[in-house]
Amino acid sequence: MQAYRSNLHSIPTDCPQREKNGWTADAHIAIDLGLLGFDGITLYEKWMNDIIDNQREAGEISGIIPSSGWGYGEWPGPVWDAVMFIIPNALYDYYGESRSIERLYPTMLRYLDYLKTKEKDGYLPFGLGDWVYWKATTNNEYTSTAYYYLDYKLMARFASLLGKDA
């Protein structure tokens, strides 16, 4: 709990000893701790607004939010970018709060349109994938495509919650 608290500086950060950046995957991996151990709703609602501000016209977002312009492109990929789906879903599950879903809905649609342009034969062949384990041999295509599926699954849920066509 103390380590998590040490990583909150108006945004969820990756670690207390090095970068202290708002890495998006680190945040969505720790969302349950943030909501169960702390009353983190306002922090995450604010950070979801940062994600909206971070999105480029083509639909991509940075792997670090806020960003000074670094971390865009195919480098971070769907595993990191899924933050815009996973955190609003967690806020809804824990608090019944749908404001983040409503605010992010157009951002999510634009992002999914962006991913469609990167798709090759139904797969997304880019992104960091399973990068933590130094001997990892999992093809990034698998992890990125799995999160692509998750994004669409959550988007269908959000469309239903908001009374929209999926």
Predicted regions and their residues:
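Extracytoplasmic/periplasmic, Sec-exported soluble proteins
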Residues: 76, 80, 100, 137-147
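Active-site substrate-binding loop specific to GH73 endo-beta-N-acetylglucosaminidase modules
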Residues: 132
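Glycan-recognition and catalytic cores of secretory/periplasmic carbohydrate-active enzymes
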Residues: 122
